[in-house]
Structures are given as C-alpha cells and as structure tokens.
C-alpha cells in the first residue's frame, strides 16, 4: 500500500491517460484558433509571395529558385484544401531543383568559372627565363632589345608576371649577364637612350630548337663536341703524345691503339707490311735451323751441348725481329702481334723447335 495512492494495475494506463489529456488540450487549442481566425482583419498580401507579384522579378540569386514554377495544387487555392493554408500562400513558389541535365554556371553563380585571362594570371607559363628573353628578342624586328623592353614584353604577354615584378625581373637580369647566349650590344652615337641592347648569339639559336622554347637547353659539352670536325682524331693523337711522351714505347703503343677506328686506319691494309716482315724473319730462322740440323752432328753429348749453345745466335736473331711495324696500326688492342703470319707457319715452327730440342739433347739410336 503506497501513501501516494494505488498504482494502476495496467503498466500502460499512465501513458493512455497522458495521451487523452494531450488530445483534449489540443482540441481546445484548435477551437480557440478557429474562433480567432474570423476576427482577424484581412491583411494585404505580402510582396513577393503572391502569384502575380512573385513572377514579375528577375531570377533570384539562389539556385533553387531559378527553375520553373510548380503547378499549384488544389488545396492551395482555398477550395477544398486544408484550413491551415490560407489562399494564395505558396502559389508562386518554385521547385528546389530545376529539371536540368547538368549544373552550369547559372546554377551556381557563386562558383563562377574564370575566363582565359584569369587562368593565365593564376598559372605560371611553362618557360624558363632564358626562353622568355629569347622570345622577346626574336619577336623584335631588329633582333635586339633593351632590358626595359624585355620587361615590357614579358609583362604584356604573360599576365602571371604582373603580380610581383621584383622577383622575375631580377631573374631575367641575372640570366642576361650569366648566360653566354645573350650578347650585349652598345648603342650607336645616333641612338640616344639609356641602357645597352641585348641580342642572341648566332651559335645559340639551335639551343631553342627553332622556336620550341619549352625544350630544355642542351648541355654545353654536347655543343662543343658537335663543333669538332674530321681532324679531331689528329688532335687527340697530339694530346696523347704530349701526355704519355713520344719517346717512350708505351706512348707509341697507346697512340697506335687510339688511332684504330679512324677512317685512315680503316683504309689501310690489315696485314700488309707486317706480314711480310714476320714471314721474312721466320724464313731466315727456319733456314738457319735446317742448316744446323743437316750438318753432321758430333758423337759426344758435350759437343752437342756446345752446338746448342752456338744456336743461341739464331734464337737471338729470331727474338730481334720486330713484333709489329711502327707505321701500321693493327686492329687487335692490348695483345702483341705474333711473329708468324699464319697457322701453318706456327705449326712448322713448333715442329722445328721440337726436333731441334730432341735431336740435340738426346743421343740417337746407334750413336755412342
């Protein structure tokens, strides 16, 4: 038993009671509203809300009010509609989203797309300062401009540089003084004024690829190498002689190796005089060895050793033969040219040496 009274048995009874009290108060409120409505004086229609008044002005700055008007519903005309909407209210309302396929500038006036001039002011041109100077000079009929004229050309043709003049003007001035492609020309006596003229070096016109100023400038080393003529190989030979020394054999061999690949070396015969010298050397050696072996060999081993020691003269003669002619450059680099010109000569030399060593170091059968 509670002191505040007995609680209802149904748990939803309290909610039902509250809902009933709310409905009673709500009905009383509407009765009061219905009684007060006829007593109000008829107010004049507000400007901009009537059908005729709202359609006369121009398009509204709001995008959701720029579309065509909605078809008025029957309940907005005051006929059989609800009493809570007075006659004429919302008759001139527009729909929120216009039935357009896409949104344009008229749909969003606050997001106006800039024109081409505005875009050029915001975007930096894709040209270097040297390219801007070259364009200014080439567009002039006299092919020469002063510093102030170059400034004027850049500012007039590229609106991006109108914002801050101090930065890019310093860069142009530095490019004129540091770049070898721009030459300073003094004023004539009959041309009064301030400042010298600037012109393009004729050798640097290829740097911009005939007006394609967006292309990067070629390296200076490439332009210097392109200026070499056919006598460049001769200059390299002289430099090699000075650095290595013409008296030393290493310097001569290095010079011969560096001269390989030139047109002069390609036109010469590959195995001309060198083959003749080596064959003559081998012929002399082979004839001497044959004469030595054909002579009656002594019967004692000590005597044979003496003959072998005498044959050193022929070996020294063979070793004294030139390996390669100093006037002919061979295509093999880093390796010496053999004395024997062909495989047959090398095999013959091997057989002769083998027979020489065996016949003179060991005794023949039947000889004591």
Curated annotation (Swiss-Prot):
PROSITE patterns: FORK_HEAD_1 (PS00657), FORK_HEAD_2 (PS00658), FORK_HEAD_3 (PS50039)
Primary residence: nucleus
Subcellular location: Nucleus
UniProtKB keywords: Activator, DNA-binding, Nucleus, Transcription, Transcription regulation
Region Disordered, residue ranges: 33-54, 243-272
Disulfide-bond pairs as recorded: none
Organism whose genome encodes this protein: Xenopus tropicalis (Western clawed frog)
Protein name from the UniProt record: Forkhead box protein I2
Pfam families for the chain: Forkhead
Gene Ontology cellular component terms for the protein in this record: nucleus
């Amino acid at each position: 038993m509670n002191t505040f009274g007995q609680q209802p048995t149904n748990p939803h009874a309290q909610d039902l009671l509250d809902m009933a009290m709310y409905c009673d108060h709500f009905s009383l409120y509407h009765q009061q509203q219905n009684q007060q409505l006829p007593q109000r004086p008829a107010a004049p229609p507000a400007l901009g809300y009537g059908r005729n008044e709202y359609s006369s002005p121009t398009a509204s700055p709001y995008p959701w009010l720029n579309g065509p008007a909605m078809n008025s519903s029957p309940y907005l005309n005051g006929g059989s509609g609800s009493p809570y909407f007075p006659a004429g209210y919302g008759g001139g309302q527009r729909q929120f989203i216009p039935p357009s396929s896409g949104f344009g500038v008229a749909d969003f006036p606050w997001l106006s797309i800039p024109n081409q001039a505005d875009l050029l002011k915001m975007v930096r041109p894709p040209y270097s300062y040297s390219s801007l100077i070259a364009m200014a000079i080439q567009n002039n009929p006299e092919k020469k401009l002063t510093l102030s004229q170059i400034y004027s050309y850049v500012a007039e043709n590229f609106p991006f540089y109108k914002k801050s003049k101090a930065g890019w003007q310093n860069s142009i001035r530095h490019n004129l003084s540091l770049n070898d492609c721009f030459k300073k020309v003094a004023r004539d006596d009959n041309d009064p004024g301030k400042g010298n003229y600037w012109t393009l070096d004729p050798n640097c016109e290829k740097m911009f690829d005939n007006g394609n100023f967006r292309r990067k400038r070629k390296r200076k080393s490439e332009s210097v190498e392109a200026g070499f003529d056919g006598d460049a190989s001769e200059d390299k030979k002289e430099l090699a002689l000075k650095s290595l020394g013409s008296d030393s054999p290493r310097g001569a061999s290095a010079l011969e190796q560096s001269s390989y690949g030139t047109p002069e070396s390609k036109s010469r015969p590959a195995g001309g005089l060198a083959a003749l010298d080596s064959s003559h050397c081998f012929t002399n050696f082979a004839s001497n060895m044959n004469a030595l072996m054909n002579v009656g060999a002594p019967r004692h081993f000590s005597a044979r050793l003496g003959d072998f020691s005498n044959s050193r003269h022929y070996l020294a003669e063979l070793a004294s033969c030139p390996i390669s002619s100093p006037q002919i450059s061979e295509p093999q680099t880093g390796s010496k040219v053999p004395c024997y010109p062909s495989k047959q000569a090398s095999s013959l030399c091997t057989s002769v040496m083998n027979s020489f060593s065996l016949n003179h170091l060991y005794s023949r059968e039947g000889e004591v």
